[in-house]
Curated annotation (Swiss-Prot):
Keywords attached to this entry: Amidation, Antibiotic, Antimicrobial, Immunity, Innate immunity, Secreted, Signal
Keyword Secreted: yes
Organism: Drosophila virilis (Fruit fly)
GO cellular component: extracellular space
Record's protein name: Cecropin-2
InterPro entries, per database record: Cecropin, Cecropin_insect
Protein family per UniProt: Belongs to the cecropin family.
Signal sequence bounds: 1-23
Alphabetized PROSITE patterns for the sequence: CECROPIN (PS00268)
Role according to the record: Cecropins have lytic and antibacterial activity against several Gram-positive and Gram-negative bacteria.
Length: 63
């Protein structure tokens, strides 16, 4: 029975220490995903601006 308690204690300590070290690479992945989202947002805004200008040119050309 003592072995079981020691095993659980060691497993908890190991899980806590690994959980804290895992946050580093998880945070990096999160930042990469966030950066991709920002680039997508910026490209969409720029694309909408170009489309609006093209629509204005087309409307002006029609008279």
């Amino acid at each position: 029975m003592n072995f079981y308690k020691v095993f659980i204690f060691v497993a908890l300590i190991l899980a806590i220490s690994l959980g804290q070290s895992e946050a580093g690479w998880l945070k990096k992945i999160g930042k990469k995903i966030e950066r991709v989202g920002q680039h997508t947002r910026d490209a969409t805004i720029q694309g909408l601006g170009i489309a609006q200008q093209a629509a204005n040119v087309a409307a002006t050309a029609r008279g």
